Amino acid sequence: PIAGSMVLAAILLKLGGYGIIRMMQVLPTTKTEMFLPFLVLALWGAILANLTCLQQTDLKSLIAYSSISHMGLVVAAIIIQTPWGLSGAMALMVAHGFTSSSLFCLANTTYERTHTRILILTRGFHNILPMATTWWLLANLLNIATPPSMNFTGELLIMSALFNWCPTTIILLGLSMLITASYSLHMFLSTQMGPTALSNQTAPMHSREHLLITLHLIPLMLISMKPELVI
């Protein structure tokens, strides 16, 4: 069910990140070197989740693995226990909560019309539902973390904190962000561009669907203008 996916991606997954932040306050801040294996594991996990996204044919699975890869960055930022790392983790959790939930919502609008989640069978929607294509483009740009979005602020803070702590992490971070951009563009092009595979008539997007996406993206854009509300 779509509601379950949206709540899981937007709230429950981020509650895990919040739990890690609370737990880290109990542990010593002076010996962050002991957390190095966990940090490498978190970043490597993010890269593996991104690579899994690239080979997905199921739209919903792709978005779910995308959430996991972003949480890998969040965990890595929390582990080093610096103010910038924690601020970046909070910013990315809030921003990606809105983004992944809106992507799940868009995936459901596509599924309701095509009755399939296979990427190659949902193509050609830019001719049929141009407004939905606009929403897909905005959501994917936010997923890539294009400036001046909150996603970009969060990832920039995380990158700065990790690079300051250990310059070698920039290789893993850079690779992760490159693959994120690749699968996001792949998802957009696969679902929206090319000739349509549909033979029957497609129902237009309902006002409630437009409202649902708007209520995800507008608050995120407003928070992006005033990030001190979160970080």
Swiss-Prot record:
Q: What does the record list as GO biological process?
A: ATP synthesis coupled electron transport; electron transport coupled proton transport
Q: What is its main location?
A: mitochondrion
Catalytic activity reads:
a ubiquinone + NADH + 5 H(+)(in) = a ubiquinol + NAD(+) + 4 H(+)(out)
Checking InterPro entries in the record gives:
NADH_UbQ_OxRdtase (IPR003918), ND/Mrp_TM (IPR001750)
Q: How does the protein's chain sit in the membrane according to the entry? A: Multi-pass membrane protein
Q: EC number(s) in its UniProt entry? A: 7.1.1.2
Which keywords fit this entry according to its UniProt record? Electron transport, Membrane, Mitochondrion, NAD, Respiratory chain, Translocase, Transmembrane, Transmembrane helix, Transport, Ubiquinone
Question: Which subcellular locations apply to this protein?
Answer: Mitochondrion membrane
Task: Supply one GO CC term from the record.
Answer: mitochondrial membrane
Where does the sequence pass through the membrane? 1-21, 34-54, 63-85, 89-111, 128-148, 156-176
Q: Read off the Pfam families from this record.
A: Proton_antipo_M
Q: Name one GO molecular function term.
A: ubiquinone binding
EC class, as a word, reads translocase
**Family per record:** Belongs to the complex I subunit 4 family.
Q: What does this protein do?
A: Core subunit of the mitochondrial membrane respiratory chain NADH dehydrogenase (Complex I) that is believed to belong to the minimal assembly required for catalysis. Complex I functions in the transfer of electrons from NADH to the respiratory chain. The immediate electron acceptor for the enzyme is believed to be ubiquinone.
Q: What is this protein called?
A: NADH-ubiquinone oxidoreductase chain 4
Gene of origin?
MT-ND4
